[in-house]
């Protein structure tokens, strides 16, 4: 736990008592502050009370006593409309912050020079965060991993000079962290997302920009217009900007050429790493993730040799191009996290041909219409869930398909067909381009079911992260 000593002897209001909310409340109290916490869910309030946290209905509170108001990132700050607690805080002139801001203030208070790498972006941030954490940890350094990736940031160990923090930040967390000042900040990409909570794409981009704007080193992927504009703007303001690209050859910065990762400066181009044979980092999208990780780790003082070792041993993340197993020459890949066509595109682009594609579930707007350019790579599709009839119409005569209905049937049929393929490496790919809740509780349960079905096949050799 990180006790928030920066708030010692002050009184703090807190709203939102989910998992991270209770952790935040405990950290505030451990630092010597008084707290009044609340939630709209009576069960959450009861859990907080049983954990020894002082609770009280903030609608009845005297807001003049509060030094700050700590808001859960899941609670609306501005859109579609501010939560009632936000209105009360603003009316009383009380500053509204979140758990990441509390971490930043405590770091500034007790160990302002400890390395702090913060990562954001619409896509790829969890993989990049996990990769950076893995590289640093593999060197034997003291590394703390948390934030939006699943570990509440205030449950980590307290800041000290030689302790590295690797923190994934959502737009909601950034919006509640006005003092965010990482040693290295990463903005991978921007596409429309969470606009119901941010009002417009411009506002969403402006919030994401804050993470890199106050960074010691701003590492920005420039393959979309929003990030390109942010990089240009920050560079013009005198901030140290390092550009990365998975698509463009840069005159200055870091870019990918296939599996080669290159650095360009002053007319010189040097190869700094290769992803050849690293199955957990297959595909152009992972080349961008690796570029960001390399630059961040270099800025934090790691050597290229240390970084290379970490890249090669990275196991990948579950449900994100996760290599589950092999049977003979057939590779089985779990990309259950791909819940829309945009997320499935990188998976299909990662294999040149002979893909046995398991796809379907609850379809999103547009279905798989945007993926037609990848259809020549697909040997056969196996359609599951509610989307089966719709996707069958989209595939038409372009791709052989069967309606498998269930994931278990799809795995069995795809494994058999791929095993009869004469290609050097056929791949059975679960990349559903759909939500899961017609047949599964969430994408994790769907991915687990795929993994279990694959590993139950006779002759499958389990794997994770190998080429």
From Swiss-Prot:
Catalytic activity of the protein: UDP-N-acetyl-alpha-D-muramoyl-L-alanine + D-glutamate + ATP = UDP-N-acetyl-alpha-D-muramoyl-L-alanyl-D-glutamate + ADP + phosphate + H(+)
Primary location class: cytoplasm
Keyword Ligase: yes
Record carries keyword ATP-binding: yes
GO biological process, one term: cell wall organization
One function term, GO molecular function aspect: ATP binding
EC primary class: ligase
Subcellular location: Cytoplasm
Involved pathway(s): Cell wall biogenesis; peptidoglycan biosynthesis
Keywords: ATP-binding, Cell cycle, Cell division, Cell shape, Cell wall biogenesis/degradation, Cytoplasm, Ligase, Nucleotide-binding, Peptidoglycan synthesis
EC number of this enzyme: 6.3.2.9
Coiled-coil residue windows: none
Positions that bind ATP: 121-127
Listed GO CC annotations: cytoplasm
Xref: PANTHER family: UDP-N-ACETYLMURAMOYLALANINE--D-GLUTAMATE LIGASE
Family, similarity comment: Belongs to the MurCDEF family.
HAMAP family assigned to the protein according to its UniProt record, in alphabetical order: MurD
Function recorded in the entry: Cell wall formation. Catalyzes the addition of glutamate to the nucleotide precursor UDP-N-acetylmuramoyl-L-alanine (UMA).
Protein name per Swiss-Prot or TrEMBL: UDP-N-acetylmuramoylalanine--D-glutamate ligase
Organism encoding this protein: Brucella suis biovar 1 (strain 1330)
